[in-house]
């Protein structure tokens, strides 16, 4: 990895008081003598709406049977859900929701593909309800949306969408006690709810097996850490615990129904993928970062067999590890067809034949493709922001620098196009969260600043997630002072 020496050609400027975004410090057109003499051409000044406006299309998902494609797109200026037949052009899509006030940010298909389900609150009150709309009834002039949780003052959660009972989902409602969610089975056709578990044990999260049976509870322990509990006939039994400075979270049941996948760093520095046997309470490591650099990033499971097929890690960029030969061949094909981008598997059909593939990069806000795994063919569906000229965007480079106490800090540096990287004004832009690390890729505010002549440094300072337990906890008692500052 290339090392950057900030003193050699890049002047760091921490204070932003002298910066004026309305009056950029660098020339922004090629009509000056200095620009004309430059070896490179300055990019045009791009309007902020191109960076910060709603994407034209985003968030596509295949129906389980592969016959339809849903995605998010503005309707009268508000993000809603649209659906089209898989063989239809994107222009033939019809809206199936018509929220005129708040954008629909999260949605998904029911297990049989009959309904689009989504969560929505009113006016930002954070009382999210679950709504359903007939996804394939596209002939009407106005979609009919049903509130499946019509209770005032509650926040609904969706815990599971089991394939084996496609007309039912498992949800949580805090109707009885605003602090905790009881667990219900919800009939998508009638809206009828059946109580499964009354939450009297301060459980924050419930996990079901692949058949929709509630098997795991997750809560904070009295010592400030967390504990995973098995749901049994006579109550809840702790089966795995971690301390306050550690991580342990269940993510999905194994197809054998006896073991559960979880992520944990209880026995090491990096978060690992593990399998926990609920009966023996013994766990085994499934995978840890092959490069021994970062925490476990994510997992993808087959829709057809429920087997683990892909793992991923976020280092300087996303790294993907196929778990069988067929997936390895698919990934090799995709990398050949889609070079120089990070590849994300967005959704799979129930038979694993079709996959939605998302691509991202520092200069690509997002593109989505339909991949037929049986024929090894790839069809581009859309770009998220087609009007944003990628040739005028600035590249983001992973770098490392050494803090005053010798700790190596990972960061990303974005330099404006068309000028030498010497004596540039620099905006240091720490991530929020406050722990959630920055990643390589398109960032609208970063590109907006770079287009106006600023270099942007995004440090993943000590206390950032993703780089192991030691790096995360190195930020304890250092906020705003000490070595972090």
Residue ranges of each PLM-predicted region?
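Bacterial N-terminal signal peptides
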Residues: 8-20
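A short helix->beta-strand "capping" segment at the edge of beta-propeller domains
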Residues: 37-57, 90-93, 328-341
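A short beta-strand motif characteristic of beta-propeller blades
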Residues: 46-51, 93-97, 144-150, 192-197, ...
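Beta-strand-rich domains and repeat architectures in extracellular enzymes and scaffolds
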Residues: 49-82, 355-356
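A flexible loop/linker signature enriched in serine peptidases of the S9 family
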Residues: 54, 72-81, 98-103, 115-132, ...
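Blade-terminus and WD-like Trp-Asp/Gly-His loop motifs, strongest in beta-propeller folds
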Residues: 60-68, 106-115, 159-168, 206-213, ...
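Short loop/turn segments that connect beta-strands within beta-propeller blades
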Residues: 85-89, 135-138, 187-191, 231-234, ...
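Serine-hydrolase catalytic core recognition
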Residues: 344-485
């Amino acid at each position: 990895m290339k090392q950057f020496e900030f003193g050699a050609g890049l002047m760091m400027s921490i204070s932003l008081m002298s910066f004026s975004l309305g009056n950029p410090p660098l020339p922004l057109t090629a009509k000056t003598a200095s620009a004309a003499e430059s070896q490179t051409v300055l990019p045009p000044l791009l309007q902020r709406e191109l960076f910060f406006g709603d994407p034209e299309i985003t968030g596509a998902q295949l129906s389980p049977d592969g016959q339809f494609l849903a995605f998010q797109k503005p309707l009268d200026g508000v993000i809603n859900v649209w659906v089209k037949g898989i063989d239809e052009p994107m222009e033939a899509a019809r809206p199936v929701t018509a929220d005129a006030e708040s954008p629909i940010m999260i949605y998904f298909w029911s297990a049989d593909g009959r309904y689009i389900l989504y969560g929505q609150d009113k006016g930002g009150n954070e009382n999210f309800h679950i709504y359903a709309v007939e996804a394939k009834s596209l002939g009407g002039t106005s979609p009919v949306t049903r509130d499946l949780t019509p209770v005032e003052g509650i926040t609904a959660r969706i815990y599971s969408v089991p394939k084996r009972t496609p007309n039912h989902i498992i949800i949580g409602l805090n109707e009885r006690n605003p602090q905790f969610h009881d667990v219900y089975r919800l009939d998508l056709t009638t809206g009828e709810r059946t109580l499964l578990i009354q939450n009297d044990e301060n459980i924050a999260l419930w996990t079901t097996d692949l058949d929709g049976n509630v098997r795991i509870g997750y809560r904070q322990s009295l010592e400030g850490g967390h504990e995973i509990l098995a749901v049994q006939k006579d109550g809840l039994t702790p089966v795995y615990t971690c301390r306050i400075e550690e991580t342990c979270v269940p993510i999905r049941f194994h197809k054998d129904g006896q073991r559960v996948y979880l992520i944990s760093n209880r026995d090491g520095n990096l978060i690992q993928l593990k399998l926990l046997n609920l009966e023996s309470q013994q766990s085994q490591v499934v995978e840890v970062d092959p490069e021994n650099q970062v925490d476990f990033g994510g997992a993808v499971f087959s829709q057809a067999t429920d087997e683990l097929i892909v793992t991923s890690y976020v280092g300087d960029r996303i790294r993907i590890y196929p778990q069988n030969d067929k997936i390895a061949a698919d990934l090799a094909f995709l990398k050949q067809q889609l070079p120089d981008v990070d590849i994300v598997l967005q959704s799979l059909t129930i038979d694993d034949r079709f996959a939605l593939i998302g691509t991202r990069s520092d200069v690509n806000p997002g593109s989505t493709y339909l991949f037929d795994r049986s024929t090894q063919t790839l069809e581009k569906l859309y770009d998220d922001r087609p009007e944003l000229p990628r040739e005028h965007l600035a590249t983001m480079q992973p770098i490392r620098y050494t803090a005053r106490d010798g700790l190596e800090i990972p960061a990303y540096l974005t330099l404006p196009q068309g000028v030498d990287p010497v004596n540039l004004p620099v905006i240091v832009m720490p991530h929020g969260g406050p722990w959630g690390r920055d990643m390589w890729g398109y960032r609208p505010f970063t590109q907006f600043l770079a287009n106006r002549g600023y270099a942007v440094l995004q440090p993943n300072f000590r206390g950032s997630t993703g780089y192991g337990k030691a790096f995360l906890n190195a930020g304890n008692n250092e906020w705003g002072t000490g070595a972090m500052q």
